[in-house]
Curated annotation (Swiss-Prot):
Residues 626-637, 939-951 have a biased composition (Low complexity). It comes from the Eukaryota. GO terms for biological process: embryonic digestive tract morphogenesis. Required to negatively regulate vulval development. Antagonizes Ras-mediated vulval induction. Acts cell autonomously. InterPro entries: THAP_Znf, Vulval_dev_neg_regulator, Znf_C2H2_type. The lineage of its organism: Eukaryota, Metazoa, Ecdysozoa, Nematoda, Chromadorea. A zinc finger (THAP-type) spans 161-249. Residues 1-53, 74-99, 452-575, 612-676, 744-788, 932-962 are annotated as: Disordered. This is Protein lin-36. Keywords: Developmental protein, DNA-binding, Metal-binding, Nucleus, Zinc, Zinc-finger.
Length: 962
């Protein structure tokens, strides 16, 4: 825009608005910035003049560089220090920023604007839509200062009761001054924050100590809103927060530059000229029309489509005469399609003051259009794109002109230069090819990876063979001699092994892949073949060790050091993963217990326990903890079943092994990977059974040895409860596991681990807490005796006297499980009887006559000594929610409520409620009160069955199974 044009109209710029970057070299900005608020108030001047008379809307004309960008004195009178005042600000720091108020105040009542239904506001803003009596003053910079009338007499959501700083510019607002808050709607809050110069993360709540702080909570002063915004929404605070926006540029705000740093210019339709300024192009086109009119002959070559307006859509027709074209260009900007859209968008965002008055072209400068549309200053390094060929000005030659507009080839070419994405105008053929190419590439990549993996697997097998041998030689050698490289290993494997040791992973662990010296590592041998090989190796162990010893001696200390380091590393890994392995072993053990044999084979027990014991006697530091013996009988049971078919072979192996001193040699343990190999390296090492022992690292796993799983009548005192062969009740398993854990727990500080299944309390009640009889409790209720269990066709009665109120759920658990598994186990253990006292109910499936009352008494005494036991149990019980219990047990709501009430009574008053009983039937658990007639029926049925069983004890138990 030219200087002359600027001087023809008074500048209405807000001098406090922009802080011009000092390095800004774009001269267009400094010229055009004079029009930021041109006509900011003109849209409302007429209305104002009725009420206020003459108002100085314009302000004084001042030189561009004397703009005070930030006041040196705040409204509260505090003077800013020199460091805060930039050279530009110092130029006219003598005058404070905004304290000059022009004219007298205007009284306004801010009723809610009628075009909006207030009920729709709740999501947009928290401010109530009520109106207030306001006093409006206009500042010298064109902004408004608004006060709530009588604010000192009443509370108003419009104003702060005290002096508060504005969140945006830190100007301290006076008491009673109107402020606005950020919208409640998150999208609009983000838009406001962007316009007010905040980043998105600034308006998120940040937790500072106990206080949750957010910029979006603070008040915003009226400086940051145009008068247009207040007028549009009738000064109503809630309407402005719901639908208005702050002004594009406001004092002390450096707005974030728009993401759109490139701009497509407007193009002249007559010549090659193009410009980003609407006014410039309009004057340029008017000049064209003047020249055309001046032509003497007045015979003009009118283009085929007519004279086109660059500010209107291409589809609109052109003007056939120059005068018509000129008239159209002189019409106001809002009569041109594209410009009208820009204006409406700006008005919607309360930024139309940048472009007002609507009929004037003067304000449509490059900067103002950008600010009105985007809401912030154009970036200093803005790129002006060259106009595309299709938008090029009309050429004088009509043939060329039609060719340019209608040339299909050109349009196709433009489309082709785009990428091949379908939406962007590329061909679908292209897309298909690309997709296919991608698929082929993917397949090829996978194939390559597979082949590489196979090669590396073969390589590592060889390396691991030598590595494994070294590990075992170390544990074998009595004279503390280890070989530098085993004779069976490939030539360079000694060097390679050093590198591979550190990177040993679960896939190529030394424990899993062991090389045989008869068979090459790559050829996998069948189990039968493997057995033969192992026999051969076992029969002549001595020559090998004899051969080895001479080669070893020279590099002995270094080798030992390296092996020691490797062992330490392995031990660290073991320590880290022992928990997971413990869980894995438990899971496998309990999953496969039915399928597996009752006793692990003796040979296997020997292999691990005695064999490693022998090793540890030779090398004191390689003593084996229970952690290594633990899983053998359980984890490898599947393996035993598969690979060691006959006891004779096993015993043969055992006999040959016994004399040999270096027991833990690679030979006896060579095993092919199973069909479904164990995932972790550690688990595999447990199955393999032999590796450098790690006693000094002490990673204890709770041992569960063969003796523990055998169980006998009196083995109970040791804390292990036996189970009948095929029963798999949770009660039995749990008792086995927990009691084992409790009995074998050495340190008093440790709490027994409560394992994955849900806990069942084995002692009927805490002996210490209540003086009532512990295990003879069933005699206290007249209907029951220990010898005669009562069954009502799958419906059990548990007297409330006989149980801890807290443990009701657990009882129901066990009852539910036992009743569901009744039928499954009936054929095998016909002598088992369902017991109805708590202790017996818990051991329902587990007790095949082995658990006597005295034994139970002993166990419970043992357990009561250990305070940790109850703590662990309670923890485990608390973990399970009532919802889970209900899902498991199908408890009726009523029953749950009753149980909860009973628990609460017990907790509060310590009373034992004996007026109800839990009645578990096929329909789910129910709570029966003694008043219920069904209670009597059940009692009678139980008594009858009791009598029957006394007469025919065998028949009674078989009945109960059905």
């Amino acid at each position: 825009m030219s200087e002359e044009l600027l001087s023809t109209r008074p500048s209405k710029r807000d001098y406090n608005d922009i802080e011009e970057p000092e390095d800004s070299h774009v001269t267009v900005h400094s010229v055009e910035q004079d029009s930021q608020h041109s006509g900011e108030e003109s849209s409302t001047v007429d209305a104002l003049q009725e009420t206020e008379g003459d108002v100085d809307v314009i302000g004084e004309d001042e030189d561009e560089h004397d703009i005070p960008v930030m006041p040196t004195v705040t409204s509260s009178g505090e003077v800013l220090d020199e460091s805060q005042v930039t050279p530009t600000k110092q130029a006219s720091s003598s005058q404070p920023r905004e304290e000059i108020i022009h004219g007298k105040g205007e009284s306004v009542y801010s009723s809610f604007p009628c075009q909006v239904i207030p009920e729709t506001l709740s999501r947009m803003t928290r401010t109530p839509p009520d109106g207030e009596h306001l006093e409006v003053y206009r500042m010298s910079n064109g902004r408004l200062r608004i006060y709530v009338v009588d604010h000192f007499k009443k509370f108003s959501p419009y104003s702060n009761l005290t002096h508060k700083p504005c969140t945006v510019c830190n100007r301290v607002m006076k008491s009673g001054e109107m402020h606005l808050n950020f919208p409640a709607d998150l999208d609009r809050r983000r838009i406001w924050a962007n316009l007010l110069g905040f980043k998105y993360k600034d308006i998120l709540r940040s937790k500072m100590g106990p206080v949750s702080f957010s910029i979006a909570a603070g008040p915003i002063c009226t400086e940051h809103f145009a008068e247009e915004c207040f007028r549009n929404h009738n000064f109503n605070k809630s309407a402005i927060e719901a639908f208005g926006v702050p002004v594009a540029i406001s004092p002390d705000v450096k707005t974030t530059p728009s993401k759109k740093s490139s701009r497509v210019p407007w193009v002249c339709t007559v010549c090659e000229f193009h410009s980003c300024s609407v006014v410039e192009l309009q004057t340029h086109l008017l000049n064209h029309t003047e020249e055309m009119l001046k032509k003497k002959d007045n015979v003009l070559d009118v283009p085929e489509a007519g004279f086109m307006c660059p500010f209107c859509r291409k589809c609109t027709y052109g003007y056939k005469t120059i005068s018509g074209y000129r008239r159209h260009l002189n019409a106001g900007p809002i009569h041109h399609c594209h410009l009208r859209r820009i204006y409406e968008f700006a008005k919607m965002n309360c930024r139309a003051t940048e472009l007002d008055p609507a009929e004037s072209w003067d304000n449509w400068t490059r900067r103002n259009v950008y600010v009105a549309y985007h809401g912030c200053e154009p970036p200093a390094n803005e790129i002006v794109l060259t106009p595309s060929p299709t938008k090029k000005a009309y050429v004088q030659n009509p043939e060329e002109r039609t060719k340019m507009v209608h040339d299909e080839e050109k349009r196709k070419k433009a489309v082709r230069t785009l990428s091949f994405v379908g939406k962007e105008g590329g061909t679908s053929v292209n897309d298909l090819n690309v997709m296919q190419r991608q698929v082929f590439l993917q397949l090829r990549r996978e194939a390559e990876i597979n082949t590489k993996a196979e090669e590396s697997a073969q390589g590592t097998k060889e390396q691991e063979s030598s590595q494994k041998k070294h590990a075992e030689e170390e544990s074998d050698d009595v004279s503390e001699l280890t070989s530098h490289q085993s004779p069976q290993a490939p030539m360079g494997s000694g060097e390679r092994r050093k590198a591979t040791r550190l990177a040993t992973s679960a896939t190529n662990s030394p424990i899993k892949k062991v090389a045989k010296h008869e068979v090459p590592a790559t050829a996998p041998s069948t189990p039968a073949k493997k057995r033969k090989i192992s026999h051969e190796e076992e029969h002549d162990p001595t020559p090998e060790s004899v051969e080895r010893e001479p080669t070893v001696s020279p590099n002995d200390p270094r080798e030992r050091l390296r092996l020691k380091e490797r062992d330490e590393q392995f031990a660290k890994m073991v320590q880290k993963r022992s928990q997971q392995v413990k869980r894995l072993i438990n899971a496998k053990q309990f999953k496969k217990q039915e399928a597996a044999t009752k006793k692990p084979r003796k040979a296997l027990a020997y292999n691990l326990a005695k064999g490693i014991a022998a090793t540890s006697s030779t090398e004191p530091e390689d003593k084996v903890t229970s952690s290594e013996q633990t899983p053998e009988p359980t984890t490898s049971q599947k393996f035993i079943a598969r690979n060691t078919r006959s006891k004779t072979k096993e015993s043969a192996v055992q006999k040959v092994e016994k004399p040999a001193t270096p027991v833990a040699k690679p030979a006896p343990v060579e095993k092919e990977p199973e069909e479904r190999p164990l995932k972790s390296m550690l688990a595999r090492s447990f199955v393999a059974g032999v590796r450098p022992s790690m006693a000094k690292y002490q990673i204890p796993l709770e041992s569960f040895t063969a003796t523990a799983s055998l169980g006998g009548g009196r083995s109970l005192s040791s804390g292990v409860i036996s189970r009948p062969p095929t029963s798999s009740s949770p009660g039995g398993i749990f008792s086995q596991r927990v009691m084992g854990a409790v009995a074998q727990e050495k340190g008093p500080a440790k709490r027994p681990s409560v394992l994955s299944r849900r806990p069942l309390i084995l002692s009927p009640r805490k002996k210490t807490s209540t003086p009532r009889p512990t295990l003879s409790h069933h005699e206290s209720s007249p209907n029951f005796s220990a010898s005669s269990p009562v069954v009502v066709s799958d419906e059990y009665l548990i007297p409330a006297t006989d149980m801890e109120v807290e443990m009701v759920e657990e009882v129901i658990d066990s009852m539910g499980n036992s009743s569901s598994e009744d039928v499954a186990t009936s054929s095998t253990s016909s002598e088992r009887q369902p017991m109805l006292t708590l202790a017996e109910a818990l051991e329902m499936d587990g007790s095949s006559g082995t658990v006597k009352d005295q034994d139970m008494e002993e166990i419970s005494k043992e357990m009561m000594k250990d305070a940790h036991y109850y703590r662990a149990m309670e923890d485990a019980i608390k973990c399970r929610t009532v919802t889970k219990m209900r899902a498991d047990m199908r408890l009726s709501r009523h029953c749950i409520r009753q149980i909860e009430a009973a628990r609460a009574r017990a907790r509060l008053f310590g009373e034992r409620t004996e007026d109800y009983q839990i009645f578990y039937s096929n329909d789910g658990a129910q709570v029966l009160t003694k008043k219920d007639p069904k209670w009597r029926e059940l009692q009678q049925q139980q008594q009858q069955q009791q009598q029957q069983q006394e007469q025919f004890p065998g028949q009674g138990s078989s009945d109960s199974q059905q």
